[in-house]
Regions:
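Conserved beta-strand hairpin/beta-sheet module of binuclear metal-dependent hydrolase folds
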Residues: 1-43, 126-142
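Fold-independent oxyanion-binding glycine-rich loops
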Residues: 9-10, 29-30, 80-81, 103, ...
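Divalent metal-coordination and catalytic microenvironments
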Residues: 18, 28, 57, 77, ...
Length: 147
């Protein structure tokens, strides 16, 4: 059974998980490694089962925890060109982690099918439609300016 779980949300940090069984993906990581790791552990999730991290945009409440988390857990990071360029230029993603640009069509992220779509915000921002291994579809869009 697939689930969408908000680990934390608000102006101090945002992070969510979509999981099917033990397999999962993370969306954004706006708080430190301790907070995120504790939340994942509380859910019984092992980092080895994570397919990667989807990033919606560059604001600190969505990426503040990435650098330290990725140093300990070198996962692939997915997103739009503008956001990945920002993360790379600012040293947020270590060289040991792959940056993978999503094009807008459905692409495989582990066992999940992910489609990126643009959203309205003051910096380039995207949402994600996630097709799970058990044939469910979930959509996440954060920090929406206008619908």
């Amino acid at each position: 059974m697939s689930e969408f779980i908000s680990l934390y949300s608000g102006s101090s940090g945002n992070c969510s998980v979509v999981r099917t069984g033990e397999k999962y993906i993370i969306i954004d990581m706006g708080k430190g490694v301790r907070t995120t790791s504790a939340a994942l552990k509380e859910l019984g999730l092992n980092i080895s089962d994570c397919a990667g991290i989807l990033v919606t945009h560059e604001h600190s409440d969505h990426v503040k925890g990435l650098a330290t988390f990725l140093k300990k857990n070198p996962l692939p990071v997915y997103g739009a060109d503008d956001t990945l360029d920002f993360l790379d230029a600012n040293g947020i993603v270590p060289a040991s982690c792959a940056l993978r640009t999503l094009s807008g069509g459905e692409e495989d992220v582990g066992d999940f099918g992910v489609t990126m779509f643009p959203t309205s915000h003051d910096v380039p921002c995207v949402g994600y439609r996630i097709h799970t291994p058990d044939n469910k579809t979930m959509t996440i869009a954060t920090d929406l300016g206008v619908l």
